[in-house]
Amino acid sequence: MTAARTPLHARTVPLDYGPDALEFDGSPTVLFDRPGLTLVGWGTALLVPARDAAAALAAIPCDDAVNVLGSGPVALGALPFTDAFDGHVVVPRFTMGTSRDADGVTRRWATAVGPADIALPDTGELFDAVIWQYGTTPAEPAPAASAADLTTAMDSAGYAAMVADAVRAMAQPEATLRKVVLSRPVEVHLGGALSLAAALRRLRAGEPNCTIFSMPVPAGTFFGASPELLVARHGTKVSSHPLAGTVPRGDTARTDADAQRDLAGSTKNRAEHRYVVDAIAAGLGPFCEELSVPTEPSVVAFRSVAHLGTRLEGRLGARPVGVLELLRPLHPTPAVGGTPRPEALSFIAGHEAGERGHWAGPVGWVGAGGDGEWMIGIRSAQLDANGTTLRLRAGGGVVADSDPDAEAAEANVKLATVLDAVVPGASVQLR
């Protein structure tokens, strides 16, 4: 028998000023920070399985004096790669939001969620409650933790061998597998406790065009800098921006331009990318009365790598559909699983070292009206509850003409991107 939840209510008020959440002396409970929108929450008003989030939010009446994207009660979380909707999301006790539109207009607000029989604070009280309960002192620059030991259940040579196995499997006459995304894990034991807020600041400084996130998961915190939008719903507008097909950035302007030009013209990378675009279009199509799917990808460059990317945009039909319902048929896309999905997931289960956990699972937020944004949880790490052990994973898409050594090198570049942002210099231990 499931105990009835305590009835909740919520209040959202405008703010004239909002401090940077990453400058507090303590880490927030949840963080979703992309160019144009920041949601940061403290405390837990409700912890609910993702499959029940829409109904739980709809049951929270809210006095919302702001009424913009992300205001009102929201649920945020990181969902596991496998059985994503069994994962949990958090409705924070206090949420501070900032939005910046295309015209440069900034809106700030705070939302409180609490038991329905207890009065919620007004504007000044709400702001003070957040500041005084969760930290008032700007964080001092924290010394970076050192990597005392780096271990892995699969080194680069083992990863290359796994890629070679996949290529051979695709070459069999009866093979139906066309693409599989493979990854390898790394575990870092730190010489001292990691300052999560400092690590997030370094990630944001290094990848300003990514979504910086930090979410509680069982036995720790899952955080990172995701470059890839799985799905967003803003009113009737739907969008997705998959990335697939990758090259390392060049060391000079010329070599970088050459690498990006080669990526744009690569038959192998374009085919790998198209599998993802077609799968997302097929998943979103039944919900949309209009869906724009560009025929040509663009090159999207980040600090260490460049990807092929395609932005899909659509308009929902008459039936109301929340972002979590849109998410369900999409995950895992061929960008993190493969195609056909059953064959790819079977190969992953039989060949990868260890469980993926939350790596490459959906990370994001959903509001009471069904709006929300979900990224793919790559370029990420999980920090244990003591703050002394990091677990990372990275990899890439494998198709019939993939080169195992090149794929192993690409995986190392992706691992190093996160490692060196979180624990500067740790990537020298990668093997």
Locations of the language-model features?
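An anion-binding catalytic pocket shared by soluble metabolic enzymes
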Residues: P35-P49, D83-F94, D103-G104, R184-A271, ...
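A short glycine-rich, hydrophobically flanked beta-strand micro-motif that places a catalytic Asp/Glu
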Residues: P28-V30, L76-L79, V180, I212-M215, ...
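Cofactor- and metal-binding active-site motifs of prokaryotic enzymes
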Residues: T2-T137, S156, P216-L230, D371, ...
